[in-house]
């Protein structure tokens, strides 16, 4: 039986380390938040404007989703923080009884790069809705998130694409540290809302270390690893992840932003990450792609027209209990309900994967789980991604 270790953290968040892998950096924790406890490692589905695309709040709760995301930038535009505050925050507005994490709006510096300009004051966006210019400062980002009432808030950071090099990366890192201090000062609800810092520094190890050194001086409830998953080489990606977890405090949660592919999740748990989010499972569902332990099924393809198996015979989600691949294939031709059913399955797959990862850590068999996972995901070991093999070897998990 794994030993239970109690670790204190700043209220209103508490992190209890339930078990640690004796070989790698993987760990299973219980994260106490205002609306419920969150078991980690955890995958968090993303709802841009207060809802998941293709799934309701009740259905998410039925899948035992303990925490999901909302987007501060888009919610700040539509329907606006004043209206949401009148509905008793985003929880009341979307009738969600579990935890919410809101991002800061900073990622839109990359995703809407042609519509934005960054200065020390903040980031100026040209609204994609009406073309008006909007200045988002650290103070305004926190004010919006205070109105939304999320359980975890993210600092506004200066985000640059992971493929950018040169002085802009260093500028963004130092500015993110300064903006963190402004966000901390602006938070009106430190007793109810947890503000996470976001580590920046691009693919430069020295800049990452400098950011880690400065940000960990601040007594924030948790830390996110930002600026990755944006098209950089996977060899660079995993090295920045493990460098970050090496320097982050053991007693605080570690959130790797924007990561959602199954292999990436498993490898990055091994590297010491606790929390993940990505639009991938919902976005790919809209194109008819269903996630399975051996990869994905493209249900629009003709080969599934007469296939009466569920998406995954071992899956217990509502979609797999009721519908066949053939039915979903046929539904795609005439009804958007197919996307809805596949979205439910894909989110269930991600949540179930993380529950299995967690249980393997508690049972002290995480390295064995990783080997079994990789064998099922890839037809042969020769097809294992070299970056994943190297990353796992760095934490003493050998796949050969």
From Swiss-Prot:
Subcellular localization(s) per the UniProt record: Cytoplasm; Mitochondrion outer membrane
Domain of life the protein comes from: Eukaryota
Swiss-Prot/TrEMBL keywords: Cytoplasm, Glycosyltransferase, Membrane, Metal-binding, Mitochondrion, Mitochondrion outer membrane, Transferase, tRNA processing, Zinc
Amino-acid positions noted as binding queuine in the UniProt annotation, renumbered to this chain: 103-107, 157, 200, 227
Family classification: Belongs to the queuine tRNA-ribosyltransferase family.
Quaternary state and interactors: Heterodimer of a catalytic subunit qtrt1 and an accessory subunit qtrt2.
Matching PANTHER family: QUEUINE TRNA-RIBOSYLTRANSFERASE CATALYTIC SUBUNIT 1
Name this polypeptide is given: Queuine tRNA-ribosyltransferase catalytic subunit 1
